[in-house]
Amino acid sequence: MIQLGINLQTRSFLININNKEKIWQIVHQIPSGKVASYGQIAKLAGLPGYGRYVGYTMKTLPTSTKLPWYRVVNSQGSISFKKGTKQYLLQKSLLEKEGIVFIKGKFPMSKFGWTQGAE
């Protein structure tokens, strides 16, 4: 668990930190050239149904993070940022550098989707 150096008063805050760490650990495992959905990450972290929480966790990462946040996408095989925005273009560029092929803004999850333990 992350040591914050402060007295934590609420159990829910500790649980929140633990959940974020689980999510970070799973995202760290996604290999180059593969992607995982928000819901998939939530399920692997023991948080089924909390895909939006995974999205929030990715959104609140520091800009200097080394975590491959861009490998987390929606379950339809596309980027969740609005098409054409700075964030969309950055994520698309990073995925393309790893060999993800976009066709009309999407990519086949059957080809590029990550299955934990299948590396």
Segments predicted by a language model, with ranges:
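Nucleic acid-binding interface residues in structured DNA/RNA-binding domains
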Residues: 5, 13-119
